[in-house]
Amino acid sequence: LDKLTGVFAPRPSTGPHKLRECLPLIIFLRNRLKYALTGDEVKKICMQRFIKIDGKVRTDITYPAGFMDVISIDKTGENFRLIYDTKGRFAVHRITPEEAKYKLCKVRKIFVGTKGIPHLVTHDARTIRYPDPLIKVNDTIQIDLETGKITDFIKFDTGNLCMVTGGANLGRIGVITNRERHPGSFDVVHVKDA
């Protein structure tokens, strides 16, 4: 009996990414990187505080790592970014330490909090106060992981590169050609395959 899948698969704990759109740390270390054979060994690795996600040490073996997260293992000097491959699965994508200093986030919503402070919420549940007033929903912002500040942003615009993060075309990369507004239902964004 295969005890690693189906009902026995590790359920990701609650965290910044949705249950359906994340990868528990234990799978990443055990099945993807082959650093451990059993769940116990993953626990031992995590408890020695080697693993960092987005620059913070995570010891929870079922911590949900999701799209665009940076996983760094100081002991081996490796950095990974979680990215979908064309089939819509998470790929192990190694990156340089320079690239591991930032991540890209999609802006989910923008609202004005108490005393008129503008807030911005990203796809991995980060809340940032006082964002640039030019940033709108669906834009992409580049976040410096050490400070959590916005360093740069890309408008949601025609002619930009994009990556599909959900649905049947998950993981496909293309150029935004045009966007149809459908008031009351979903907008349709036409993407030309790269």
UniProtKB/Swiss-Prot annotation:
One Gene Ontology cellular component: cytosolic small ribosomal subunit
InterPro entries: KOW, Rib_uL2_dom2, Ribosomal_eS4, Ribosomal_eS4_central_region, Ribosomal_eS4_central_sf, Ribosomal_eS4_KOW, Ribosomal_eS4_N, S4_RNA-bd
Keyword Magnesium assigned: no
GO MF term set: RNA binding; rRNA binding; structural constituent of ribosome
Name assigned to this protein: Small ribosomal subunit protein eS4
Taxonomic superkingdom: Eukaryota
Domain S4 RNA-binding: 23-85
Gene: RPS4
Origin species: Equus caballus
PANTHER family in UniProt: 30S/40S RIBOSOMAL PROTEIN S4 (PTHR11581), SMALL RIBOSOMAL SUBUNIT PROTEIN ES4 (PTHR11581:SF0)
UniProt keyword annotation of Ribonucleoprotein present: yes
Keywords from the UniProt entry: Ribonucleoprotein, Ribosomal protein, RNA-binding, rRNA-binding
